[in-house]
């Protein structure tokens, strides 16, 4: 038997008249721990009798077996328990000295469950199993353990946008409101438009590397409001075409000399 956290709990325990009598999905216990045939003998309305179990499907939310009891026919049926089913249905009027009762609970409400059942001789002890009774010449043992709860599928967390990103400008220049003032060229500190992107989560991907980065204009390129444009023009020197040709005259002597040289002779 695998470890409890890897094994599946039992979803049913019943009787089978023979190894071939159990329905689909049920497993018949045909061998005891000593290796002998686990035929519980007559007395159940059939020529023989075997215990059979069904296992809960992985991830199933159906009921699981939380306890099994073997009682005499003189004992009343315990509250919360049901008679173990028999395959095929027994004939009416057949007496049974021992009866098998099973308690089923929803998987979400159960903390422990039965994971396995084994049969052994009455004088044999099965480690890590609990004896629940005797039928015929066999002792019946069950293995209980903590029931691992089925965890719900993970739900992705909603994406949140920080307040700092919401305050950055995420809109293009053509999307700016017409009533908002445009930054003046003479201002030393550039301003950027505040845009609330709470309603537009996709616009965060339009953010460039320079959005929200302040910059300062060098004083050399600033224009004083009191300065006169005529004072700036007095520093300019106007040159004629002849002055420009004389100052930047280039005769290409080096290039012409290099082009006139004959290629070296090949010996």
UniProtKB/Swiss-Prot annotation:
Keywords: Cytoplasm, Endosome, Membrane, Protein transport, SH3-binding, Transport. A motif (SH3-binding) lies at residues 154-159. Residues 210-259 form the UMA domain. GO terms for molecular function: SH3 domain binding. GO terms for cellular component: cytosol; ESCRT I complex; late endosome membrane. PROSITE patterns: MABP, UMA. GO terms for biological process: endosome to lysosome transport via multivesicular body sorting pathway; protein transport; receptor catabolic process; regulation of epidermal growth factor receptor signaling pathway; viral budding; virus maturation. Residues 7-146 form the MABP domain. Pfam families: DUF2464. It is a peripheral membrane protein. The keyword Metal-binding does not apply. It is found in: Cytoplasm; Endosome; Late endosome membrane. It comes from the Eukaryota. Belongs to the MVB12 family. Component of the ESCRT-I complex (endosomal sorting complex required for transport I). PANTHER family: MULTIVESICULAR BODY SUBUNIT 12A (PTHR31612:SF2). Component of the ESCRT-I complex, a regulator of vesicular trafficking process. Required for the sorting of endocytic ubiquitinated cargos into multivesicular bodies. This is Multivesicular body subunit 12A. It comes from Gallus gallus (Chicken).
């Amino acid at each position: 038997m695998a470890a409890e956290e890897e094994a599946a709990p039992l979803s049913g325990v019943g009787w089978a008249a023979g190894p071939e009598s159990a329905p689909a999905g049920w497993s018949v216990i045909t061998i005891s721990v000593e290796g002998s045939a686990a035929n519980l003998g007559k007395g159940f309305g059939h020529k023989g009798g075997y215990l059979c179990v069904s296992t809960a499907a992985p991830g199933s939310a159906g009921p699981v077996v939380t306890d099994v009891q073997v009682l005499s026919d003189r004992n009343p049926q315990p509250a919360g328990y049901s008679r173990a089913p028999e395959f095929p249905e027994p004939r009416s009027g057949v007496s049974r000295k021992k009866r098998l009762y099973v308690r089923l609970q929803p998987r979400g409400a159960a903390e422990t469950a039965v994971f396995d059942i084994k049969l052994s001789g009455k004088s044999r002890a099965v480690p890590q199993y609990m004896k629940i009774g005797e039928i015929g010449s066999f002792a019946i043992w069950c293995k209980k353990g903590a029931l691992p709860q089925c965890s719900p599928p993970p739900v992705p967390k909603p994406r949140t946008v920080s307040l700092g990103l919401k305050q950055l400008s995420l809109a293009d220049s053509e999307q700016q409101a017409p009533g908002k003032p445009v930054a003046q060229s003479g201002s030393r500190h550039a301003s950027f438009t505040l845009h609330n992107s709470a309603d537009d989560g996709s616009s965060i991907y339009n953010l460039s590397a320079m959005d929200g980065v302040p910059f300062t204009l060098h004083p050399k390129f600033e224009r004083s409001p009191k300065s006169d444009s005529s004072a700036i023009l007095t520093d300019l020197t106007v040159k004629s075409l002849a002055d420009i040709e004389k100052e930047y005259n280039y005769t290409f002597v080096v290039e012409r000399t290099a082009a006139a040289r004959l290629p070296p002779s090949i010996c």
